[in-house]
């Protein structure tokens, strides 16, 4: 089944070459940022963000990064990861590409 992961606003940092996502604040788990929470998960034997991202790449997921989100957050010049095939787009592109009988999950 085809899957597209759509990254917008600060989530765009997850696809940046410099792992800036690790510094993003989190609202759960008692951690101050994404990196601290991810490290805690790793110590508990839970798959890390990098492991899950690599699994999505291996399974052929599409990664779409929101052009408006990049501009709105001043990230349009941010170098992107070279281990993830990222395609630019927007919400309209994402919705247009969505299957009529598929599902959209927002987390």
Regions found by a protein language model. Name each.
Residues 23-58:
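A glycine-rich helix N-cap at a beta->alpha junction
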Residues 40, 47, 93-107:
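Flexible, low-complexity linker and terminal segments
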Residues 14-25:
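Glycine-rich loop at the start of a catalytic domain that most often binds anionic cofactors/ligands
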Residues 12-15, 71-73:
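Short, active-site-adjacent cap segments at secondary-structure transitions
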């Amino acid at each position: 089944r085809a899957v597209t992961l759509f990254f917008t606003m600060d989530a765009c940092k997850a696809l940046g070459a410099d792992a800036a996502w690790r510094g993003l604040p989190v609202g759960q788990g008692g951690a101050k940022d994404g990196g601290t929470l991810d490290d805690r998960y790793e110590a508990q034997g839970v798959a890390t963000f990098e492991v899950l991202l690599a699994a999505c790449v291996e399974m052929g997921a599409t990664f779409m990064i929101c052009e408006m989100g990049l501009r709105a957050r001043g990230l349009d010049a941010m170098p992107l990861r070279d281990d993830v095939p990222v395609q630019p787009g927007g919400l309209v592109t994402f919705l247009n590409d969505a299957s009529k009988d598929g599902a959209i999950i927002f987390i």
